[in-house]
Amino acid sequence: MENALSSQNLGFMPYLVAGSQILGIANLAITGAWLAQLQRRFLWSGPLQFNVHPLCMVLGMVFLCGEALLVYRVFRHETKRSTKILHGVLHIMALVISLVGVIAVFQYHQANGYPDMYSLHSWCGIVTFTLYILQWIIGFSLFFIPGVAFTYRSQFKPLHEFFGRALFLSSIATSLLGLTEKMFSEYSSHPAEGILVNSLGVLLVVFGAVIAYILTREDWRRPPLPEEQALSMDFKTLTEGDSPTDQ
């Protein structure tokens, strides 16, 4: 992603973007190593089915969600349509992969007679995932489907941005709750695994902090291209019936 920033005078933003990519890959590598080696790999059935859940949630709700949030900061010369499509595709990938993780843990609980939805992790997780689905549906309806009034899009955009960031941070917090729940009774008997999981938790927090900082910098926001400004005003005139010169 950082190559798209090379021609921009954006201070140290390219280094933060590069750092976020390294952190994201490190999170996935540590999660995979933990589950594949110390938790004895992955299976879709039996006692190892649970291992599918944390990998899918870290990949989907944390890494891919974070990548989707960075699209409008990183790709500054590509058309708005291209960046919008990439943003939406990354979110739908995150949604599908996370859905696999949710199904895996429910099936694992059912097969082993464990109760569902009893822990704080599960409550936060299902609320975050449900809101993520609603966020995607509403965002798709307003920003991808042609003909939606300019006023509705402009009014909802701040809420869309806020909930996107809030759900990303909520996903990281829920992941930390899940890691603690998984390892709570095993720290004393598996110290090496405990260190690895704690390291993963710290890296998840740093990954979230770096992306959150990039998103808070308004001066790093993607500027509209000249042709996009003209199209935006034409679209507003078409859907609202007013003239740009009247504003």
UniProtKB/Swiss-Prot annotation:
It is a multi-pass membrane protein. Heme b 1 binds at residues 53, 116-119, 121, 181. InterPro entries: CYB561/CYBRD1-like, Cyt_b561/ferric_Rdtase_TM. L-ascorbate binds at residues 80, 84, 153. Heme b 2 binds at residues 73, 80, 87, 160, 221. Binds 2 heme b groups non-covalently. It is an enzyme of class 7 (translocase). Its cofactor is heme b. GO terms for cellular component: chromaffin granule membrane; lysosomal membrane. Specific to neuroendocrine tissues. This is Transmembrane ascorbate-dependent reductase CYB561. It comes from Xenopus laevis (African clawed frog). The gene is cyb561.
